[in-house]
Amino acid sequence: VSGGLHGVGASVVNALSEWLEVTIYREGREYKQRYERGHTMYPLKEIGTCAPDQAGTTVTFLPDKEIFEETVYDYDILKQRLREMAFLTKGLKIVLRDTREDSKKENTFHYEGGIREFVSYLNKSKEALYPEIIYCEGEKDGVAVEVAMQHNDSYTENSYGFVNNINTPEGGTHIVGFRNALTKTFNDYARKNKLLKDNEPNLSGDDIREGLTAIVSVKIEEPQFEGQTKQKLGNSEARGAVDFVVSRQLE
């Protein structure tokens, strides 16, 4: 599943579709515009009225079979991505509805707990080591930071990074900042409370993150990704912002 970066998502979908229609409901009026293979069929025009409180936009399109060999949508891929988006934007309600005759189904995603519920969902088949999901939120240098985490009885770390709701499978500076903050804060606490003797080495980051499930979500105005597929974040300010927010709130 791809995500936008330069504001060209709708233009790309339009160019790759046999046709695309946009219907807008605003201030009691309904407007429409249609495109075919990227070309405007008619300018935006008013086509009727709607309820005064109805507002929003409907975008309908048909993938171009001359471009794509396969035009059948995979419901499960869409379901996973839309669930992610609902977790990452607390309070947002997303309805996924399949109206194809041979596969009719529907799912609704709505999570008031946001990424806390995301961690709970990821840990549902595991035994949590403590009941509370640790949550940190803040902003620094124009970077909004949200982090939720909880350890479980497994031996594997599962830390997932998101930038403007886009998954970064290879991590990046936001994940580096999170791990730095976690390692430093745990070791400072252990030293201060005499859990580590003066002659003992610090706890390693790998040991601290064993069995950890975490979501690290940042919102940043000008994200810099390594590669077009957005696998990894490169903004240095994201590292500092996540480190600052997590360190301060864990202390």
Q: What residue ranges belong to the model's regions?
A:
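Surface-exposed beta-strand-to-loop junctions
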Residues: 60-62, 160, 244
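Flexible beta-alpha connector loops of hexameric P-loop NTPases
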Residues: 68, 167-170, 234, 238
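Hydrophobic (often cysteine-bearing) scaffold residues that line and stabilize catalytic clefts
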Residues: 74-78, 174-175, 238, 242
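GHKL-type ATPase core
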Residues: 1-121
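A ubiquitous short alpha-helical element
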Residues: 46-47, 232-235
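GHKL/Histidine-kinase-like ATPase module
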Residues: 76, 83-85, 91, 95-231
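Flexible helix-coil linker/hinge segments at domain or subdomain boundaries
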Residues: 90, 236-251
